[in-house]
Amino acid sequence: MSTLRVLHEKSELGKTTVYPKEYTPHLLLPIPRDLNRKTLNVNVSEPPPFYGYDLWNAYELSWLNEKGKPFAARGEFIIPATSSHLIESKSFKLYLNSFNNERFADAAAVSQTMKRDLSKRVNESVTVNFILHETEIPVAYSPKGSLLDVLDIAIDTYSPDPNLLSTSQETVTETLYSHLLKSNCPVTGQPDWGSIEIHYTGPKIDHAQLLKYIISYRNHEEFHEACVERFFMDILRHCRPQELTVQARYTRRGGLDINPYRSTNPTFSVQNHRSFRQ
């Protein structure tokens, strides 16, 4: 069954939204990661050829204490890339809204409930953190590499084409980034805007061709997580780096932003540095 068919049958995407009035964990819609990975010719009977996570920031998160007083926080959810499923975004939004009128003893009780529900849906332990005070919010992050967007290019390809990628014989270690990433929701067609950062060691990637490849996603319809995995696999296969990390930070929609990270390095650390567009 295709990802689109699963979503059309089960998701609230593209439908009139009815917001829950009480805690409703069954709203969460898990989507098998294998559905997309098969299209990338990834052997789904083995562990994926990368490590990483999907980091979600939730900006519209609230609940009641036992006296009925509302509390608010920013939520941070870290779902391992090795989990069997991802969570469909609108179902996640509705699930979080189901906490709005629910009473809890404290923030820890809320986060523990969310951790239990999410971990059950994706079949792996999910990390849940709450940012409760302004002093905990990180400052905007600027990548330390080369910005590709300053390059003057001509392009008329707006669907992913890995054949655009090319390398030279020189071996380098460098970080490249772009704010021109755009793809689209595969169900609603809504645009997904983001920034992408690529760090690698290997044959030097032609910068102009890499920018063209990034822009080629402009009319592509695929989820955030799937786009980043497609980036990773295309660069890995066509450019053959010894080390590779690809991460994207998408702008928010419906009070959520999604930030997938994929790497050949198994000893990565989770970094939640918000971009200036977030």
UniProtKB/Swiss-Prot annotation:
Listed Polar residues bias regions: 261-278
Function: Catalyzes the NADPH-dependent reduction of 7-cyano-7-deazaguanine (preQ0) to 7-aminomethyl-7-deazaguanine (preQ1).
Compartment(s) of residence: Cytoplasm
InterPro entries: GTP-CH-I_C/QueF (IPR043133), NADPH_dep_7-cyano-7-deazaG_red (IPR050084), QueF (IPR029500), QueF_N (IPR029139), QueF_type2 (IPR016428)
Residue segments, region Disordered: 255-278
Keywords: Cytoplasm, NADP, Oxidoreductase, Queuosine biosynthesis
GO biological process: queuosine biosynthetic process; tRNA modification
Presence of keyword Cytoplasm: yes
GO MF, any single term: preQ1 synthase activity
The EC number(s) this enzyme carries: 1.7.1.13
Protein name: NADPH-dependent 7-cyano-7-deazaguanine reductase
Assigned protein family: Belongs to the GTP cyclohydrolase I family. QueF type 2 subfamily.
Binding of substrate, residues: 87-89, 224-225
